Amino acid sequence: MRFDLEPPSSTAAAHRIGVLLINLGTPDAPTPRAVRRYLAEFLSDPRVVEIPQAVWQVLLRTLILPLRGRASAKKYAAVWMPEGSPLRVYTERQTDSVRHLLTSNGYHVMVDYAMRYGSPNISHALAQFKRAGVERVLLMPMYPQYSASTTATAFDAAFDALARMRNQPEVRTVRHYADHPAYIHALAEQVRQYWAQHGRPDFAAGDKLVLSFHGVPKRTLDLGDPYHDQCQQTGALLTAALGLSTTECRVTFQSRFGKAEWLQPYTAPTLREFGEAGVRRADVFCPGFTADCLETIEEIGMEVRDEFLAGGGKAFHRIPCLNGAPAWIGALGEIVAENLQGWPVRAAQPETVS
């Protein structure tokens, strides 16, 4: 194996600490070519699609990418912001806010972000840390619930980059925070603040709150992936924090891909059924997405909305993701600080932003 070039070793090195926030990724532009390039990388990950690659790559290159590239590009174009992809824009803002929070509390750390697919990639971010003298790295996935297809593959990419380093940094990983009190508090605050501005559903009249998580094949649950259970755990804690019953608040799963059975109940059919059953208002919130993206803005805000209204529903509300909410930035700072304990950060734990 050839190792990456290293800066000269020095006892006067910076000995810095780096915090890397990791999200899924996004195309560089809402064009068919950029989307196909992104999907090719994403769907070629064996952690994402567990089909023998010799068979899968033929299907991917000859059928899926040509068909989905243009259709997906139109969807991305519908949600694209002036600054770029929503996921990248919100992740950059979160990174800036966490950096400011930690710095203002005396933390001597670097904070950056990377995407598992697309750019900026994890290998590049770790190389940037190394050039800045970082010798300790905390990998902080922006996935509250652990899954092999998200968290594990992010760690795979980081460890692949480390495998090419002669002089590796010390590394810690945040596996999940599905039940972290600060995360649950931030979710509850996001819902409460939305209701304060737009009115609370009339649960006594049958209105519903739906907590929609990204789906994964049911087979992964049977094989031991904890994602389903952690989504249910988050859902139960948030339901309790809001003072709701399991009749008033339901957990569902979205973004099914292919014909295999995925985790159920599925989000879109559930909303359609609610409309047909006479539910007048449905609010949908996506606790597993820490930043708004195609799956929340377009899939939930447009496709799922249309299903509910077509079923007879009258009022549909998509509650925005955590994005840059102060309670969420404070929770991120708290989770990061807990996982930096024992490293020379030169300051106390940051306070929660109010």
Curated annotation (Swiss-Prot):
Catalytic activity: heme b + 2 H(+) = protoporphyrin IX + Fe(2+)
Binding site for Fe cation: H214, E295
Family to which the UniProt record says this protein belongs: Belongs to the ferrochelatase family.
Pathway recorded for this protein: Porphyrin-containing compound metabolism; protoheme biosynthesis; protoheme from protoporphyrin-IX: step 1/1
InterPro entries xref list: Ferrochelatase, Ferrochelatase_AS, Ferrochelatase_C, Ferrochelatase_N
Location within or outside the cell: Cytoplasm
Enzyme class: lyase
Protein name: Ferrochelatase
GO cellular component: cytoplasm
Role played: Catalyzes the ferrous insertion into protoporphyrin IX.
Membrane-spanning ranges: none
PANTHER family cross-referenced by the UniProt entry: FERROCHELATASE, FERROCHELATASE, MITOCHONDRIAL
Keyword annotations from UniProtKB, A to Z: Cytoplasm, Heme biosynthesis, Iron, Lyase, Metal-binding, Porphyrin biosynthesis
GO biological process, one term: heme biosynthetic process
